[in-house]
């Protein structure tokens, strides 16, 4: 799936890049795999509700 049409994927990647964080760093903080974070950012899957809350806290949004 192309993330250009997925605002959630776009926002997740933008927030991570804005903070200069690696996929590995975000994955470690959220206790998920690097592949899971990449899938969220590519629009291939969505984080569950608990991970959405953790993402909001991590990115302070």
PLM regions: where:
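DNA major-groove recognition helix of helix-turn-helix/homeodomain DNA-binding modules
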Residues: 50-61
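Residue-level signal for the short linker/turn that defines the boundary of a DNA-recognition helix
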Residues: 10, 20-21, 47-50
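A short, Lys/Arg-rich alpha-helix, primarily the initiator
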Residues: 1-18
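Short, conserved catalytic or interaction motifs in soluble domains
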Residues: 42
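Short alpha-helical DNA-recognition segment
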Residues: 20-39, 54
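Short alpha-helix boundary/capping motifs
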Residues: 6, 45-46
């Amino acid at each position: 799936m192309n993330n250009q049409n997925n605002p959630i994927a776009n926002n997740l990647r933008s927030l991570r890049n804005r903070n200069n964080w690696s996929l590995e760093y975000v994955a470690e903080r959220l206790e998920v795999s690097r592949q899971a974070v990449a899938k969220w950012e590519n629009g291939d899957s969505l984080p569950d509700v608990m991970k959405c809350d953790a993402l909001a806290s991590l990115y302070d949004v």
